[in-house]
Amino acid sequence: MAKMATSRFKLLLCLTAAILESATMCTSDVENQQPRILLQPFEVMQSFHSHFMNSLAVFLSSYYEVSVISEENHRFTTRHISDNKDLNFIKYQTLRKTNQPVMMDIKDDGQLPMKVIQDIKSKGEEIMRMRYSDAGLLKTVREGNYSLLIYNSMDYGTAAVCQFLDIPCIQVITSGMGSVHNPYSLELVNSVPYMLSEYTDLNSLSKRIVNTLFYLSDHYMRTLYFYPGVVSVARDIGLFDHNTADSIDYLTMAAETPVSSLIYTNNAADCHATLPSSYVRIGGALLSNTTLERQFQTIMDRSIDGVIVVAFGRGAGTFNQHTLRLMIKAFGKLNHTVLWSIGSQMEVFKDTYTIPPNVYLFDSIPQNALLAHPNTQLLVTHSGQGSTTEAIYHGVPILATPLRMDQKTNAKKLTKLLGMGLTLDIRALTAQELYKKIQHILSTNEYKTNAIMASHTFRQCDRYPERNILNTIKDAINSPVNINSDRKPKHWVQLISVDVLIIFSSLPVVVFLCLVKCCTIRQKKV
């Protein structure tokens, strides 16, 4: 009897030990489980915005398990990151009759800004509808146990997705400070330069008036133009309840949803702008990797007379043959090596033009790594957000050839404000003018000195951007959902500075007095 009791006791001990060991293993597995991040790239246009989101996905895959939402036939996403084995891809099927991806095509033929805005709205709504009408994608995302969703701020509908999935979200603002929309405070508007505001002093009254006008325009464009369409799509695809969708204040939801905002800016001049704690500057992020492939490294190392990098982004394929011949002629007269990114025109170039021996053509180039090389002396650029940031970061003078949209603002910022180059009107180009401006920049030390100073200021301002990204993500993962839900946006009249408000308030009075004066003069004449 005692032996039987002893056997039972031993069996009980064994079972208890097994249960404890199993519990310990499960606890260990939970503790060691890597947080899962869902990244929604910006697929509306092939641009710096989409490129940065893809680069961010690759960077984060070294620290987290990252899944990327992507359209099945999206060439841009597929080309750049689909072969990365550290990333998981959640594909959704296109609803279009063709296999062409939904993508904006911004032309250089005088396309009006309103047409661009209309395209962003329509394409954004179309992609949102396609993504989350796919029941398989929505099921995969909901069951994926994701700790965080990261999205681009121009994906206006993602706030609805975050609320539906009930997970923390971070928005990435890749258009610089000018795209910061903070409905809780106008502090940003009072000190941060917006689009076109390089024409005024940084902290002057005129600057604040311009910035406030842009803020109000952006505010009402979102409220009256973008957000109603987003709410309609969200209701149609089941993210919002049909009965309550019309009563949703999407402006408030869009403001409350992001736990944090990562701001990628290329402007060292706004370094001291006051930012709320949830806004984190990451200018210069992901630019520290400057490793070159052997092909490029060999060319750069042997070019002791210096290298000129030429890249026009998406504008590379928009120049006519006359303009291209003028460029080739000017580049061929230089003693420097020219590395030219020409996009998909490689075969056309070789068959159509005689390429000088000092000019090397590539369909794409590792621009950031090339600018970091000590032999690089100049960047000829369209002045996009990515190119100008890389030029500032590495202290390389520029010859700016702005083509569209914010590129003219970027060009003025670098040439007028920072003094690190010159601007050239590519539409009135002559080979002699191009050659002379390149030679002038290369022979004037002031441009290089100013570029180095801008680089120093920029790096001191946005220190440790990669660390800032990781810390922000860590905090967001550990934060409760709807952390900002107790805050309500105030009306802009409550936030606007007193002097600007006085000026705005006096305008109707001034107009009224002018009308009275005009009527009085007319009556006297009668």
Describe the residue ranges of each PLM region:
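Nucleotide-sugar donor-binding patch of glycosyltransferase catalytic domains
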Residues: 188-189, 281, 351-363, 389-431, ...
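Nucleotide-sugar-dependent glycosyltransferase catalytic domains
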Residues: 2, 6, 29-36, 42-45, ...
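Conserved donor-nucleotide binding/catalytic region of nucleotide-linked donor-dependent transferases
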Residues: 417, 421-422, 427, 435-454, ...
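Cleavable N-terminal signal peptides of Sec/SRP-targeted secreted and luminal proteins
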Residues: 7-25
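A donor-sugar binding/catalytic signature common to diverse glycosyltransferases
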Residues: 73, 149-151, 363-411
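Donor nucleotide-activated moiety binding/catalytic core segment of transferases
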Residues: 305-306, 314, 339, 343-345, ...
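Short beta->alpha connector loops at strand-helix junctions that form conserved
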Residues: 90-95, 173-174, 382-383, 400-404, ...
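Conserved beta-strand positions in the Rossmann-like core of class I SAM-dependent methyltransferases
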Residues: 67, 339, 399
